[in-house]
């Protein structure tokens, strides 16, 4: 890479989410002036470990644990105000972090209401065996209201009369829908106004036009870091539809979600695990079964931060990563949880798919085709040495080095960082010119 000192760094989950974006955001936040989350909602969780203390977050950007940086919730994020209330700030206050000073929220974010969560739950029950595995946080129905132009944005609460009118209009229809599904308890305008007004007063001073904040940061040559939730394979358009999220967590959506021109994005990092996981429903060609599956799940603590659900476990999928590389235009990538693979005697890597007797090297666009794909695997020797205290690539066991080099060869993108444990200090940066 050139000697450019990158000012704008975007990180994109390149699998099915849960790749470790929270940890990496916290890591780079130590150098950033601004951290911006541009999409998703509180359906995605992030776990950060600092000096062996574990913190689980959902809506506040992971950079909140850096007192020097400003954290921004961008305009395409959907927000449950209760998750931003004072009661959820205890974790930060206990460690000396004041969100009133280092958090700002776009006045354009759409709000999640109780009726969104109820409808989300009902839709999942109605689908039965065809459930898509939603977290039932109301994310999809909120984005649906946005697309139908009946959504309520955070900035609407500054106009009490206008807010109440929009809420009343929505409740007329939402209550009718809920009653038809035998949920007879009405969601009333008065009750919702009281709840939302209470939460709004707590965060009112944080609400602003964040696109101006970001624009000023760019022109003042500040370093800022862009982060999404979920991953490329959960993208509404490019993922395994319909088993996807309701937003676009690929780098191409950054300009819309943040409010900047594409030319300001200097570098895009793809983040992946040294193996593969997914949660919910949908095709997963490289899935592992048996003892190795159980070992990786327990060693990697592979349970959803928000849902608590056990994640599916799979071998590293090179075809999926090439798909992500092309969609996101990944310049460098980061390998997380390499330590989890320690003591596994044979490691496998998916290098192709078998589909109807033919070998293919791409991700099919339809679920039916993708579900019929079988992995074509190569085998590499594992390692037994503890790598949790390694601080350089050269300090890794020979087989671990060979494994990383093979992944780099398959994907065709240089690895710039790898992780050997959950703590911030267990992050090894191989290319110091990233940021």
Swiss-Prot record:
Organism: Spiroplasma citri
Family to which this protein belongs: Belongs to the adenylosuccinate synthetase family.
Cellular location(s): Cytoplasm
Record's cofactor remark: Binds 1 Mg(2+) ion per subunit.
Entries under SUPFAM superfamilies matching the protein: P-loop containing nucleoside triphosphate hydrolases (SSF52540)
Protein name: Adenylosuccinate synthetase
Superkingdom, natural source: Bacteria
Subunit composition and interactions: Homodimer.
């Amino acid at each position: 890479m050139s000697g450019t000192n990158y000012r704008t760094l975007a990180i994109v989950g390149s699998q099915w989410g849960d790749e470790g974006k929270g940890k990496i955001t916290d890591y780079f936040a130590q150098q950033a002036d601004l951290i911006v989350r541009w999409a998703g909602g509180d359906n995605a969780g992030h776990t950060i470990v600092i000096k062996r203390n574990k913190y689980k977050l959902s809506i506040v950007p992971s950079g909140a644990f850096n007192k020097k940086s400003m954290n921004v919730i961008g305009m395409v994020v959907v927000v449950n105000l209760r998750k931003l209330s004072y009661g959820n700030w205890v974790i930060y206050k206990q460690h000396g972090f004041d969100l009133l000073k280092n958090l700002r929220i776009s006045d354009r974010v759409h709000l999640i209401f109780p009726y969104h969560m109820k409808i989300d739950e009902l839709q999942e029950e109605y689908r039965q065996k065809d459930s898509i595995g939603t977290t039932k946080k109301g994310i999809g129905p909120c984005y649906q209201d946005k697309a139908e132009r009946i959504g309520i944005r955070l900035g609407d609460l500054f106009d009490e009369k206008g807010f109440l009118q929009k809420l009343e209009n929505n409740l007329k229809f939402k209550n009718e829908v809920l009653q038809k599904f035998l949920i007879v308890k009405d969601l009333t305008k008065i009750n919702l106004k009281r709840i939302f007004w209470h939460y709004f007063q707590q965060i009112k001073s944080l609400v602003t036009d964040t696109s101006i904040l970001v624009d000023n940061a760019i022109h003042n040559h500040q370093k800022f870091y862009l982060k999404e939730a979920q991953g490329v394979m959960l993208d509404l358009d490019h993922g395994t539809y319909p088993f996807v999220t309701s937003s676009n967590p690929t780098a191409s959506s950054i300009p819309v979600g943040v409010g900047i021109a594409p030319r300001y994005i200097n570098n895009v990092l793809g983040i992946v695990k040294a193996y593969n996981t997914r949660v919910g429903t949908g095709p997963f060609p490289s899935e592992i079964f048996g003892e190795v599956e159980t070992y990786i799940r327990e060693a990697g603590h592979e349970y959803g931060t928000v849902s608590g659900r056990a994640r599916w476990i799979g071998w590293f999928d090179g075809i999926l990563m090439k798909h992500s590389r092309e969609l996101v235009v990944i310049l460098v990538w980061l390998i997380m949880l390499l330590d989890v693979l320690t003591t596994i005697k044979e490691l496998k890597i998916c290098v192709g798919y078998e589909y109807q007797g033919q070998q293919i090297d791409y991700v099919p666009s339809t679920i039916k085709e993708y579900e019929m794909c079988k992995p074509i695997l190569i085998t590499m020797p594992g390692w037994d040495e503890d790598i949790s205290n390694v601080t350089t690539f050269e300090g890794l066991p020979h087989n671990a080095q060979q494994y990383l080099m093979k992944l780099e060869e398959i994907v065709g993108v240089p690895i710039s960082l790898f992780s050997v444990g959950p703590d911030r200090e267990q992050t090894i940066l191989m290319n110091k010119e990233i940021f």
